Swiss-Prot record:
This is Acetylornithine aminotransferase, mitochondrial. Its main location: mitochondrion. Keywords: Amino-acid biosynthesis, Aminotransferase, Arginine biosynthesis, Mitochondrion, Pyridoxal phosphate, Transferase, Transit peptide. GO terms for cellular component: mitochondrial matrix. The gene is ARG8. The keyword Nucleus does not apply.
């Protein structure tokens, strides 16, 4: 609809954009967005603003979504082809695309070292929906054992979504407080506490706890990988007390770490009872999945949960392709290789500013650079120079580019980020 604003004059286009964003905005005020930027198209790891005739290297990938790049031609072809066949028929009936995707999720997960007892899949539309399903399934399992077994353990610095259940297990009070009372019986623990303290809490409350939800790599909290020994110990104590373990892999899963799932790097003893996926699963098309083992599935009955759009043929067709591409060892190896390139560049920048940068952490193509002060000015300067990055937590800049990003684009983006850091710190 905005084509009518484009002209051969850059000034005219910029004036048109200002009019759109300042005078013609019909969206609620829930987002803080720059008023001088409007994305009009993308190509793999780059985005373009045709209003301002600007090109950006994108190290955000739509917040770890477009794993196979913007405007992926094969994804576009699949969407177009499937749209001419069947878009939606609801979960009243089976569809081939849904059946294929469910099988592929289970088989690929097992093949690439993920949840060894993965059994069934619930398909929905977004990460928060996938986590809602996981929480409901855990509570249902708990209640079948003991009517009082309804509580959920979550962790400080967690982020699991913005719908009421997922919001209830999200740590940051700025997201929770404005909405009053949320889902009860949620306890937040500190993953950095001694294991003995965490175990004591669980042992004391074991008859009241249905599930535990955790991100193997905390994303919004600042890109913090959870130590393997902590995840092993958590699963052990939870299994002993019949508590369902949920891994939120919405941001860190699907090849992001160089493994198909972040938990694929863990021993089987630390595998979850449930894990969730979204974001990259549709490469930008809304689709998500909640994967459960047989123990969880046995607690469920027809009608316990549902969704109108979840598992629609359009989304499933795309996701089948995404899994085919990412669920390939050569592709995963390429992510690891690109991740090493990104890591090397970020560590070099840290070495130049030891008094300003306190840490570089992550794996594959999910990295966080922690500054000693809030990095908002650096993010803004990077954008001015042609690089899009985002924050995670209060002091960390997050790097989650498309998994298909070219090596030379990684290098170019690092050069821009280095200049942004130098420009800000030289003031």
């Amino acid at each position: 609809m905005y084509k009518r604003y484009f002209s051969t004059s850059l000034k005219t286009n910029q004036q048109a954009l200002k009019k759109i964003l300042e005078e013609k905005t019909y969206q609620v005020t829930t987002y803080a967005r720059p008023s001088d930027l409007c994305i009009t198209r993308g190509l793999n790891a780059k985005l373009f603003d045709d209003f301002n005739n600007k090109e950006y290297i994108d190290f955000t990938a739509g917040i770890a979504v477009t794993a196979l790049g913007h405007a992926n031609p094969k994804v576009a072809e699949i969407l177009q082809t499937q749209a001419t066949k069947l878009v939606h028929s609801s979960n009243l009936y089976f569809t081939k695309e849904c059946l294929d995707l469910s099988e592929k999720l289970i088989e690929k997960t097992k093949k690439f070292g993920g949840q060894h007892d993965a059994s069934k899949v619930f398909l929905c539309n977004s990460g928060t929906e996938a986590n809602e399903a996981a929480l409901k399934f855990a509570k249902k399992h708990g209640i079948t054992k003991n009517p009082k077994k309804q509580g959920i353990i979550a962790f400080e610095n967690s982020f699991h979504g913005r719908t009421m259940g997922a919001l209830s297990v999200t740590w940051n009070k700025k997201y929770r407080t404005p909405f009053g009372d949320l889902v009860p019986h949620v306890s937040f623990l500190n993953i950095n506490d001694e294991l003995s303290k965490i175990k004591d809490f669980i042992n004391t409350k074991k008859d009241e706890i249905a599930g535990l939800i955790i991100e193997p790599i905390q994303g919004e909290g600042g890109i913090f990988p959870i130590p393997i020994e902590k995840l092993v110990a958590l699963k052990e104590i939870c299994q002993k007390n019949d508590i369902i373990v949920i891994y939120d892999e919405i941001q860190c899963g699907l090849g992001r770490t160089g493994n198909l799932w972040a938990h694929a790097a863990l021993p089987k003893a630390a595998h979850p009872d449930i894990f969730t996926s979204a974001k990259a699963l549709g490469n930008g098309f809304p689709i998500a999945a909640t994967v459960v083992n047989e123990k969880v599935n046995n607690a469920l009955q027809v009608g316990d949960h549902g969704t109108t759009y979840g598992g629609n043929p359009l989304g499933c067709a795309v996701s089948n392709y995404v899994l085919d591409v990412i669920g390939d060892q050569a592709f995963l190896d390429s992510v690891t290789k690109k991740g090493e390139l990104l890591k090397k560049g970020l560590l070099k920048i840290k070495e130049q500013h030891p008094d300003k940068i306190s840490d570089v952490r992550g794996s594959g193509l999910i990295w966080g650079v922690e500054f000693k002060d809030a990095p908002g000015a650096i993010v803004q300067k990077a954008r001015e120079l042609g690089l899009l990055v985002i924050t995670a937590g209060k002091t960390t800049v997050r790097f989650v580019p498309s998994l298909t990003i070219e090596d030379e684009v990684v290098e170019e983006g690092l050069t821009i980020f280095n200049k942004a850091v130098n420009d800000v710190f030289s003031k």
